[in-house]
Amino acid sequence: MADDLDDLLDEVESKFCCNTSESKQTSRVMKHTDQKCDNLEERKLPRKQGRKRVENEIDIDAMLHEILDDDVDTPTSTHEPSPAKASSSAQTISKKCCPVFLGGSSVAHGIGTSVSERACNRLRCTYCDFSVITFDDHEWDSSCDYLFFRNNMPDYHKLKVHLRRRAGVRAYACQCSWISILTLSHLREQPQLKWVCGKHRA
């Protein structure tokens, strides 16, 4: 019975620990074998960790590329073509407008600074969490109300019912706020608008 138990233990050790001889071993030899197994595992561990680290870095890079590609595909305006896909580098630099400007259709889009006064075209509403869309050479009809934008945003075909053509004006709207602007102005001059720059890719 004891021999059968020893044989069973030897078989378990040979399958799950490391290769040991088929013959029965004394406790001293078993301790020595356990130490060898531990040393082998310690040697294998840095390689396994290195492989896992490389695999994790590859997975993280792939996820970052996917996220960046998704962000680039979202349109900022129904009248403008969506921006070209940025390079798939994970080190893309994002910049915010400071200060944030709004402006009519004669004002160029881009990153607004105190030196280059450009109308921000990456606006996002912090209240309804919608991207702000713009329509050049249009203004909002005075009959617009909150429910109209709530129900029709961002479908241009439904929104155009309350858009009127007017040269030089740019119509801005999110799901909860709207405004028509003719000249360059600071966003802070419009306290009712809860809009912020949603970052530009440089």
Swiss-Prot record:
UniProt source species: Danio rerio
Biological process, per Gene Ontology: Kupffer's vesicle development; melanosome transport; photoreceptor cell morphogenesis
- Give TM regions: none
Q: Where is this region: Disordered?
A: 71-90
Q: According to the lineage, what is the superkingdom?
A: Eukaryota
**Tissue specificity remark:** Ubiquitously expressed during early development and in adult tissues including the eye, brain, heart and kidney.
Question: Which InterPro entries does the annotation name?
Answer: CFAP418
Annotated protein name in UniProt: Cilia- and flagella-associated protein 418
State where it is primarily located: cytoplasm
Show the GO cellular component annotation of the record. cytoplasm; cytosol; photoreceptor inner segment
